[in-house]
Regions:
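Glycine-rich phosphate-binding "P-loop"
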Residues: 1-11
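Short alpha-helix plus adjacent loop in nuclease-associated cores
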Residues: 59-80
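Acidic/histidine-rich catalytic cores and adjacent linkers
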Residues: 14, 19-49, 57-61, 80-229
Length: 229
């Protein structure tokens, strides 16, 4: 099944999904989504037999954003330090964004040196970076639901003082996030489709008429344009 919706509003998505029929909707066993609360309530409303799984990559993105925000805030902190420590912190943080966010095992030798400088200058960023790496590893290495759930609980305890916003969100979505350890489902395919849709929009210099865009998108994937609403 494929559905293209003109808006992200819940009622618009529901209208399209309702056209699939109750029989199809009742047979959906799992829905992978990002951390959007309205969509979760919609799934519960129209897909009674579906389990919701949060895409692990959206959760990881949230961690990255909070780490980067802490990096930016450290620049503000540096202004109130003495000249020597201020220069050390500023110099280490300059150009450090992608070094901090990229998986440590994938860093170049130069980036490893930069990471060492940042950790030396900012104990807080050092801890947050370590927690970021641990968070990534628990999704990569947990063999089953039990192990993944226990490791995530342990991570939440250690991270509560550093990733306050993320910890609150993960706690609120705990069941849906830990569902990944059991089913290993992500939105990877959908994200790939979205990237192609963005490319299509660029090639078409934008589409003012949604029906024209819908037909072009269906033809792009070799679906008959008769599927368009």
């Amino acid at each position: 099944m494929i559905g293209l919706v003109s808006e992200r509003k819940q009622h618009k998505i529901e209208e399209v999904m309702r056209t699939w029929g109750e029989k199809v909707l009742s047979q959906i066993e799992e829905v992978s989504m990002d951390l959007t609360g309205n969509y979760k309530s919609l799934v519960k409303k129209i897909c009674p037999n579906a389990e919701v799984t949060v895409d692990r990559f959206h959760v990881t993105k949230m961690i990255y954003e909070e780490l980067n925000q802490a990096r930016i805030e450290q620049k503000i902190v540096a202004k109130f330090l003495n000249a020597k420590n201020r220069a050390k912190l500023f110099d280490s943080l300059k150009g450090s964004k992608y070094t901090l966010l990229r998986a440590e095992k994938k860093l170049s030798d130069q980036q490893k040196i930069k990471l060492k400088e940042v950790k030396s200058a900012s104990p807080m960023i050092k801890i947050m970076h370590s927690l970021k790496e641990e968070f990534h590893a628990l999704f990569e290495k947990s063999k089953d639901w039990g192990e993944g759930t226990l490791r995530l609980i342990d991570w939440l305890k250690k991270a509560s003082s550093y990733y306050q916003k993320s910890v609150k969100t993960i706690t609120r979505w705990f069941a849906e996030i830990t569902g990944y350890f059991e089913r290993r489902t992500t939105k990877g395919i959908v994200e790939g489709i979205n990237n192609k849709l963005k490319l299509l929009k660029r090639c078409g210099f934008g589409f003012r008429n949604f029906n024209n865009f819908e037909m072009r998108a269906l033809l792009f994937w070799h679906f008959p344009k008769s599927l368009a609403h």
